[in-house]
C-alpha cells in the first residue's frame, strides 16, 4: 500500500547517505493517519509534534513519520583554528 512512499523515502535517504556532511532520517511514529469525510486528516501525536502524516495521492490512509535533516556543512571544520582559539584554556 505504501510502496511509492517507501520508494520516495528510500531515494531521499540514499541521496543523503552519499554525502558525509548531510544527515537525513525518517522514523515511524508508531501510528497511522486517515482522511476524514470532510477531507481533513487525523492528527499525528507524540514526539513533541514532530510527527506528520505522509500519504500517497488518492489514498485515504497514511503513516505518521518524523523526519530530520541536518546539513553539517554549515558548521565549521572541527580542526578549524577558530574553534581551537575559542576553546577554554586551563
UniProtKB/Swiss-Prot annotation:
What cystine linkages occur within this chain?
Answer: 29-51, 33-53, 44-64
Q: Where in the cell is it found?
A: Secreted
Major subcellular site: secreted
Glyco sites are at 32
| Keyword terms of this UniProt record | Disulfide bond, Glycoprotein, Secreted, Signal
Keyword set includes Secreted: yes
Endpoints of the signal sequence:
1-18
Superkingdom: Eukaryota
What GO MF terms are annotated?
C-X-C chemokine binding
Cellular component annotations (GO), alphabetically ordered = extracellular region
Asked whether the UniProt record includes ATP-binding among its keywords, one would answer no
- Name the job this protein performs: Salivary chemokine-binding protein which binds to host chemokines CXCL1, CXCL2, CXCL3, CXCL5 and CXCL8.
Please give the name of this protein: Evasin P1128
Amino acid at each position: 500500500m505504501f510502496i511509492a512512499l517507501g520508494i520516495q523515502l528510500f531515494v531521499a535517504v540514499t541521496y543523503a547517505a552519499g554525502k558525509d556532511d548531510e544527515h537525513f532520517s525518517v522514523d515511524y511514529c508508531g501510528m497511522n493517519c486517515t482522511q476524514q469525510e470532510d477531507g481533513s486528516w487525523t492528527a499525528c501525536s507524540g514526539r513533541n509534534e514532530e510527527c506528520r502524516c505522509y500519504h500517497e495521492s488518492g489514498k485515504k490512509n497514511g503513516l505518521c513519520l518524523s523526519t530530520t535533516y541536518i546539513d553539517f556543512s554549515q558548521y565549521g571544520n572541527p580542526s578549524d583554528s577558530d574553534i581551537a582559539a575559542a576553546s577554554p584554556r586551563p
